[in-house]
Amino acid sequence: MKLKGKGIGKVVVEGEVIVSRKPLSFLGGVDPETGTITDPESDIKGESITGKILVFPKGKGSTVGSYILYALSKNGKGPKAIIVEEAEPIVTAGAIISGIPLITNVDISKLKTGMRVRINPQEGEVEILAEGNL
């Protein structure tokens, strides 16, 4: 199955998905040294986003969140890619300065943690390759 959205980036990426059904703040919500979700309100608290394709509905919080995303990337703890239903400026800027491929305007209800997907930002496509841990 392929989902269509809008993409930022040029690199086709394949990997395991980690899905949050709640908005995410990178400032105070993710540890930039470990890549672990620290937000006590998050449905994926304690999980690592390192090397995974991070899926969430939208960002929230401070503009500093863009720099936390950059720090995650510089520390080798960032996500491999981001899929977000609604990409607001914080997440968009963070993905751009970090070189993290991003797909937005996608119905994330079709995605579940553990799925394997391929994203093609130039085409704005998310292709589900394997169902994973349902």
UniProtKB/Swiss-Prot annotation:
PANTHER family registered for this protein in UniProt = DUF521 DOMAIN PROTEIN (AFU_ORTHOLOGUE AFUA_6G00490)
One GO biological process term is:
isopentenyl diphosphate biosynthetic process, mevalonate pathway
Its keywords, alphabetically, are: Isoprene biosynthesis, Lyase
Q: Which CDD domains match?
A: AcnX_swivel
Q: What is this protein called?
A: Phosphomevalonate dehydratase small subunit
Function in brief? Component of a hydro-lyase that catalyzes the dehydration of mevalonate 5-phosphate (MVA5P) to form trans-anhydromevalonate 5-phosphate (tAHMP). Involved in the archaeal mevalonate (MVA) pathway, which provides fundamental precursors for isoprenoid biosynthesis, such as isopentenyl diphosphate (IPP) and dimethylallyl diphosphate (DMAPP).
Documented EC number(s): 4.2.1.182
This protein's assembly is summarised as: Heterodimer composed of a large subunit (PMDh-L) and a small subunit (PMDh-S).
Keyword set includes Transmembrane helix: no
Looking at the record's lineage, which domain of life comes first?
Archaea
Asked if the keyword Lyase belongs to this entry, the reply reads yes
Quick one: which pathway? Answer: Isoprenoid biosynthesis; isopentenyl diphosphate biosynthesis via mevalonate pathway
The record's active-site residues are 62
Query: Which species is the source of this protein?
Result: Pyrococcus horikoshii (strain ATCC 700860 / DSM 12428 / JCM 9974 / NBRC 100139 / OT-3)
Question: According to its UniProt record, which protein family does this protein belong to?
Answer: Belongs to the AcnX type II small subunit family.
TM ranges are: none
Q: Write the lineage as a comma-separated list.
A: Archaea, Methanobacteriati, Methanobacteriota, Thermococci, Thermococcales
